[in-house]
């Protein structure tokens, strides 16, 4: 049985398997669009912010 999924970027249906090297995306273009959205912080993993992981402000700056 062939599993079909929709590309998360353009919603094109594709077969999940070795013939789809960019899965879950349909193409390199859709893969790069998604990567760009993460890099531009348009996407993020929801959850509480851990203050220990935040950088300290430079001297004289205020926390936002």
Swiss-Prot record:
<feature type="binding site">
    <location>
        <position position="10"/>
    </location>
    <ligand>
        <name>Zn(2+)</name>
    </ligand>
</feature>
<dbReference type="Pfam" id="PF03884">
    <property type="entry name" value="YacG"/>
</dbReference>
<feature type="binding site">
    <location>
        <position position="26"/>
    </location>
    <ligand>
        <name>Zn(2+)</name>
    </ligand>
</feature>
<dbReference type="InterPro" id="IPR005584">
    <property type="entry name" value="DNA_gyrase_inhibitor_YacG"/>
</dbReference>
<feature type="binding site">
    <location>
        <position position="30"/>
    </location>
    <ligand>
        <name>Zn(2+)</name>
    </ligand>
</feature>
<feature type="region of interest" description="Disordered">
    <location>
        <begin position="43"/>
        <end position="64"/>
    </location>
</feature>
<dbReference type="GO" id="GO:0008657">
    <property type="term" value="F:DNA topoisomerase type II (double strand cut, ATP-hydrolyzing) inhibitor activity"/>
</dbReference>
<keyword id="KW-0862">Zinc</keyword>
<dbReference type="GO" id="GO:0008270">
    <property type="term" value="F:zinc ion binding"/>
</dbReference>
<dbReference type="GO" id="GO:0006355">
    <property type="term" value="P:regulation of DNA-templated transcription"/>
</dbReference>
<protein>
    <recommendedName>
        <fullName>DNA gyrase inhibitor YacG</fullName>
    </recommendedName>
</protein>
<keyword id="KW-0479">Metal-binding</keyword>
<comment type="function">
    <text>Inhibits all the catalytic activities of DNA gyrase by preventing its interaction with DNA. Acts by binding directly to the C-terminal domain of GyrB, which probably disrupts DNA binding by the gyrase.</text>
</comment>
<comment type="similarity">
    <text>Belongs to the DNA gyrase inhibitor YacG family.</text>
</comment>
<dbReference type="InterPro" id="IPR013088">
    <property type="entry name" value="Znf_NHR/GATA"/>
</dbReference>
<comment type="subunit">
    <text>Interacts with GyrB.</text>
</comment>
<feature type="binding site">
    <location>
        <position position="7"/>
    </location>
    <ligand>
        <name>Zn(2+)</name>
    </ligand>
</feature>
